[in-house]
Amino acid sequence: MFGETGTGDALRPIFMDVVSVQSQVVYGHVGNNVALPTLRAHGLNVAAVPTVMFSNTPHYPTLHGGALPIDWFGGYLSDLSARGALQRLKAILVGYLGNPEQVAVLSRWINQVLAEHPDVQVIVDPVIGDHDTGIYVADGMVEAVRELLLPLAHGLTPNDFELGHLSGRSADSVEQVVAAARSLLTDRVQWMVVTSAAPGTWGHDDMKLLIVTRDDAQVLSHPRIPVSPKGTGDLFSAKLTARLLEGMPLAEAAASASDHVVTALEATRRAQSLELQLPSNPCITHRE
């Protein structure tokens, strides 16, 4: 009715700016449910590749779903390449992964993409756990992420707990966080933004994040909002990625992402919601 059908071989594909590889839920705001609207609000074409599919996050009384079958997961990635959708790719954003097998498949695919498109930025949020929950990923994930995924990243956005486990070092003070972060930097891994950093140094109403490169370290403080929805790290890494792709310097991008998360947390508190409330205009929160 609206056009001729066919294989589309002669037509141009949708060129993706970002491939976001994360969790997906039917109900709630975590993983790609957060990353997709945040990145798209900045005018980016995004391919959302699910790693797990859950009804909701595990802190509810009921939970259904699980990790995607490995042949499905690998197929999603390889078919993006097969469709020609990656010719203008700018970034790969990685979040929650379902098991070590997914880490291995994803790492091989990223290597293939980088061989063809070496300028693509790889930003990894190495989701492992947090101080209040402990490790909440599958057995073997810490080792798989450390050995296979981290070496491919240009930048990392761990929380304080994850930094400690990945580096094998204490990360209680600012100095310890900087040392632990730099132990993971390489010629390829250029920077790290550590969220919920150095908790032993927080005031009653503030928290810290640290921006660490080989030659510099900056501390940013932000308000401590008395709510704890899931998905704040996913929101932070998506906003950070969007700002970096706009050409914003790392420290400014991290500040903008931090402000954005604080805005979301304030909205969540006002709504008295268990779920993270996304800002109504995801592009406006930027520290002047």
UniProtKB/Swiss-Prot annotation:
Its GO biological process annotations read:
pyridoxal 5'-phosphate salvage
Which Gene Ontology CC terms are recorded?
A: cytosol
Q: Where does substrate bind?
A: 23, 59, 234
Q: What GO MF annotations does this protein's record show?
A: ATP binding; hydroxymethylpyrimidine kinase activity; magnesium ion binding; pyridoxal kinase activity; zinc ion binding
Q: Which UniProt keywords apply?
A: ATP-binding, Kinase, Magnesium, Metal-binding, Nucleotide-binding, Plasmid, Transferase, Zinc
Annotated residues that bind Mg(2+) are located at 136, 162
State which residue ranges cross the membrane.
Answer: none
The annotated pathway is: Cofactor metabolism; pyridoxal 5'-phosphate salvage; pyridoxal 5'-phosphate from pyridoxal: step 1/1; Cofactor metabolism; pyridoxal 5'-phosphate salvage; pyridoxine 5'-phosphate from pyridoxine: step 1/1; Cofactor metabolism; pyridoxal 5'-phosphate salvage; pyridoxamine 5'-phosphate from pyridoxamine: step 1/1
| Domain of life of the organism encoding this protein | Bacteria
**InterPro entries, A to Z:** PdxK, PM/HMP-P_kinase-1, PyrdxlKinase, Ribokinase-like
- Keyword Isomerase assigned: no
The UniProt record lists the EC number as 2.7.1.35
What are its cofactors? Answer: Mg(2+)
Q: Which reaction does it catalyse?
A: pyridoxal + ATP = pyridoxal 5'-phosphate + ADP + H(+); pyridoxine + ATP = pyridoxine 5'-phosphate + ADP + H(+); pyridoxamine + ATP = pyridoxamine 5'-phosphate + ADP + H(+)
On subunit structure and binding partners, the annotation says: Homodimer.
Role according to the record: B6-vitamer kinase involved in the salvage pathway of pyridoxal 5'-phosphate (PLP). Catalyzes the phosphorylation of pyridoxine (PN), pyridoxal (PL), and pyridoxamine (PM), forming their respective 5'-phosphorylated esters, i.e. PNP, PLP and PMP.
- Which family, according to the similarity comment? Belongs to the pyridoxine kinase family. PdxK subfamily.
Q: What is this protein called?
A: Pyridoxine/pyridoxal/pyridoxamine kinase
Give the originating organism: Cupriavidus metallidurans (strain ATCC 43123 / DSM 2839 / NBRC 102507 / CH34) (Ralstonia metallidurans)
